[in-house]
Amino acid sequence: MKRFECSAIVFDLDGVLVDSTEYVEQQWRRWAVSKGLPIEPFLRVCHGRRALETIRLAAPHLNAEAEVAAFVPEDEAGGQALRPVEGAPRLLETLPVGSWAVATSGTRAVATDRLRRAGLPIPGVLVCAEDVLRGKPSPDVYLLAAAGLGVVPTECLVVEDAPAGIEAARAAGMGVVAVTTTHRPEELGADAWTTSLAGVHVGRIAQNARQGRMLELLVLDL
């Protein structure tokens, strides 16, 4: 078990709160087939990245800006319910209001739709692809989330599942817990890892005039 202290927690969305990995990969398969492109380069880099950066990396010969304007994610589920990652509903219920945010590489429309379909609350601070000029692995989404929560970046803990997101959190000066839904622990280089949010628990919640709110987070290597 590892113990962390932080003022706020910032979650990635896909693969961390919502079990949407299958839909993300299906979208890229459909798009690659429609362009006559091999899918493997896209699957290697799509997790944790915006569509813009994914296309730039996997198909550098294309005009990524023009392509992403026509890239409209559509889940194969057709609006049906999505599963939350195990432990996500319980963990979010135990966190104080205003102590957590979501920072995702998806658009706001996709993010809010997936949260609703998974039965999860939409946080007061939700940072999405269109909110930043640079997507992950640049730290912009996490820095913006910290600002929205009113805490300094070094007092935030990030929960991620993808190398690009972990690199972004590191660049923002934040600690990182990895959920191994899309990558193996050795691929991630996080401060701690767990197979699902069932392994993450809120311990003590303290409040004082000097530091403000302080959360204790316990992470079990499940």
Region spans (language model):
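Residue-level marker of regulatory loop/turn positions in helix-turn-helix DNA-binding domains and
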Residues: 84, 103, 134
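N-terminal helical cap/lid subdomain that shapes the substrate entry/recognition surface
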Residues: 2-96, 107-109, 120
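Short linear interaction motif-like sites in intrinsically disordered regions of transcription factors
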Residues: 29-32, 101, 194
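Short glycine- and Lys/Arg-enriched binding-loop motifs that mark or flank ligand-binding interfaces
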Residues: 11, 44, 102, 131, ...
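Asp-based, Mg2+/Mn2+-dependent phosphohydrolase catalytic module
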Residues: 1-6, 99, 108-222
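Hydrophobic residues in well-ordered beta-strands that form the structural core
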Residues: 19, 102-104, 178
